[in-house]
């Protein structure tokens, strides 16, 4: 056999092996079919614009992916790196210093009424950090089972902590697996500071993400990233305990959400909808093939800056974007303080600041 024929045979065998792998190799995911609604165009309430092109970057020091951002009563700024460190900045954005180290993955950050920083840590559970940086574990399980991947949280006026478990199957480093599988592996929980117990509020969420309690404390919002929507769970009144869709068919993946304490919820769309993902969501077999591809060949999130504000009825009242994302990209959380927005990100090493005036 000539050298050329041998090479052709070798290439053919390699191609056949690759096809067999893509078609038949076992996977961790067990996807189900879902037909997503057609993505809304970037017109009308989502009209494309470049208002976020002037975001100011505030360096936290050496580190990556400060997903959430929180401010204490003195205006100091906090962000959590992916290696467990939570950094603090002065109110003017200067003097980064280590505030605490969870040795986990701090994702959700919010201050309670006593100025303790409450943390949803994907690896360590629900934590409380006092102003001196001392860490206390509030909870690591609910309903007799340890937490999966905790994601975000908010604290109600009565001290109840509402928080999400993004997935009880996949760790945060494999969050794309949960999105590809598209099973309702997430839930919303509540921690009672009086009993020190956690309980499940809502199950069956497709990648449970951001959490925000309404200004009047009558409901809590939870982002369902896998279905491009925000859910509302009533906490009081005649519909107490019931859930409903608050806003549906978003133009991007909803990540963090926060209340401004008055009349708005700020919602971070971490990246626009992915056309390839929307095309394969109805086809579990194709999603298994994508899962088997090397990471560098799998669909990637688009670098984009996208934040909207919703009123208490779920209507879009603010629309801030930057398609170039030259200043700041992949905004994962947004907090308003005195007419200024502060951003966390899964694609940056800094937090962001933007004046609304």
Residue ranges, per PLM feature:
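Sequence-structural signature of mature extracellular/luminal beta-sheet repeat domains
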Residues: 2-357
């Amino acid at each position: 056999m000539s050298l050329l024929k041998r090479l052709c045979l070798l290439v053919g065998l390699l191609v056949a092996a690759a096809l067999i792998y893509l078609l038949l190799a076992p996977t961790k995911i067990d996807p189900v079919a879902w037909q997503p609604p057609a993505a809304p165009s970037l017109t009308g309430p989502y009209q494309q614009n470049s208002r976020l092109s002037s975001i100011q970057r505030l360096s936290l020091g050496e580190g990556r992916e400060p997903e959430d951002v929180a401010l204490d009563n003195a205006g100091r700024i906090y962000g959590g790196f992916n290696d467990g460190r939570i950094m603090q900045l002065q109110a003017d954005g200067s003097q980064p210093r280590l505030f605490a180290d969870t040795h986990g993955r701090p994702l959700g950050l919010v201050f309670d009424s006593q100025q303790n920083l409450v943390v949803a840590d994907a690896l360590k559970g629900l934590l409380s950090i006092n102003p001196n940086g001392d860490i206390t574990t509030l909870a690591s399980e609910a309903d007799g089972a340890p937490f999966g991947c905790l994601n975000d949280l908010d604290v109600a006026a009565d001290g109840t902590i509402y928080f999400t478990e993004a997935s009880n199957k996949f760790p945060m480093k494999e969050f794309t697996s949960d999105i590809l599988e598209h099973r309702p592996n997430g839930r919303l929980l509540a921690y009672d500071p009086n009993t020190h117990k956690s309980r499940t509020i809502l199950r069956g969420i497709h990648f449970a993400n951001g959490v925000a309690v309404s200004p009047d404390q009558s409901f809590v919002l939870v982002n369902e990233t896998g279905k491009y929507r925000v859910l509302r769970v009533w906490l009081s009144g005649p519909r107490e305990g019931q859930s409903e869709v608050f806003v549906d068919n978003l133009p991007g993946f909803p990540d963090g959400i926060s209340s401004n304490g008055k009349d708005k919820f700020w919602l971070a769309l971490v990246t626009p909808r992915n056309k390839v993902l929307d095309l394969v969501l109805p086809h579990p077999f194709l999603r298994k093939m994508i899962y088997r591809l090397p990471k560098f060949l799998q669909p990637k999130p688009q670098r984009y800056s996208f934040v909207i504000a919703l009123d208490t009825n779920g209507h879009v009242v603010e629309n801030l974007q930057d398609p170039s994302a030259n200043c700041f990209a992949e905004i994962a959380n947004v907090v308003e303080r005195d007419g200024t927005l502060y951003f966390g990100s899964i694609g940056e090493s800094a937090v962001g600041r933007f004046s609304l005036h």
